[in-house]
Design a protein with these regions (language model features):
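ATP/NTP phosphate-donor binding region
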Residues: 1-102
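Glycine/threonine-rich beta-strand-loop-alpha-helix active-site module
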Residues: 84-130
């Protein structure tokens, strides 16, 4: 499949509704954000997959997240997430964690960007590189 990107904003607006997506987002900032997060997951009956910033590994308040089996630890010190990172994570989730119905990003901007891009690509048939 060949994809030709429009050269200007007017070209992008003609792509609608293809160029529209919604990402349900909830941001939790609190003294017990991790506890609240796990409570919300339990209330929803969700099966979460976590994308976690490796910089949080030594912080005890995040230990419960790092103890989860269903996780991917992203090292943002090496680079910002690339399309190849997104595609690899999508394939890992589809192959080994297909029962997960909630994607949770924890950490800084790179981990959050990777989580959002992965969520979009899981819901769509094309790769991020496409």
């Amino acid at each position: 499949m060949t994809c030709i990107a429009p050269l200007d904003i007017q070209g992008f607006t003609k792509l609608a509704p293809w160029w529209r997506t919604e990402i349900p987002t909830e941001i939790v900032l609190s003294g017990d954000g991790i506890g609240e997060l796990f409570s919300m997951i339990a209330k929803r009956g969700a099966k979460a997959f976590f994308v976690i910033d490796s910089a949080l590994q030594d912080q005890t308040s995040f230990a419960r997240v790092f103890d989860q089996k269903e996780k991917f630890i992203f090292n943002a010190t090496e680079s910002e997430p690339r399309t190849g990172d997104v595609d690899a994570l999508v394939e890992e989730i589809r192959a080994s964690h297909a029962d997960r119905n909630l994607l949770v990003g924890i950490g800084g901007g790179a981990a959050m960007d990777l989580t959002k891009a992965t969520g979009i690509c899981i819901a769509n048939p094309l790769r991020a590189q496409d």
